[in-house]
């Protein structure tokens, strides 16, 4: 059986509670709550733990949201901004360019949203992108014959 990952390969679990980024040879390099804070002009102010700390405490002009809810992307623009910020962090830490990536997405994501997620990851430097719904990723991870 061939390995799913090779050098400079990444896995992203874009989850409703947390987002994780795995880099082959380094393990999990990012594990953050799937939360983003932004102002009323659309500027991202915080993501992950920093944004989660603002939940219920932010002033009126700052929205703090979980852009993925109940297995679907409820706010695509915020999801895109959050994913970009997380990728920028992971790529800067590991100094990775020209990578392949598997992105696990909630099962309720539409084909249009899958293509948009793929495009975001490509813009960040991915040479190949594979979108995999989370139930399938879980089955593969459990060693089930799929």
Annotate each PLM feature.
Residues 1-146:
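Nucleotide/phosphate-binding catalytic cleft detector across ATP-hydrolyzing
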């Amino acid at each position: 059986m061939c390995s799913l990952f090779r050098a400079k390969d990444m896995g992203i679990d874009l989850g409703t509670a947390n987002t994780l980024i795995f880099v082959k040879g380094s393990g999990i390099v990012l594990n953050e709550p799937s939360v983003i804070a932004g102002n009323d002009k659309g500027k991202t102010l915080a993501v992950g733990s920093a944004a989660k700390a603002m939940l219920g405490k932010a002033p009126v002009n700052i929205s703090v949201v979980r852009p993925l809810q109940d297995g679907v992307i409820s706010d695509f623009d915020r999801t895109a901004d959050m994913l970009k910020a997380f990728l920028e962090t992971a790529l800067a830490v590991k100094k990775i360019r020209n990578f392949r990536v598997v992105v696990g997405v909630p099962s309720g994501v539409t084909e249009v949203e899958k293509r948009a997620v793929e495009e975001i990851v490509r813009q960040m430097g991915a040479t190949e992108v594979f979108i995999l719904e989370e139930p399938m990723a879980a089955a593969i991870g459990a060693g089930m014959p799929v």
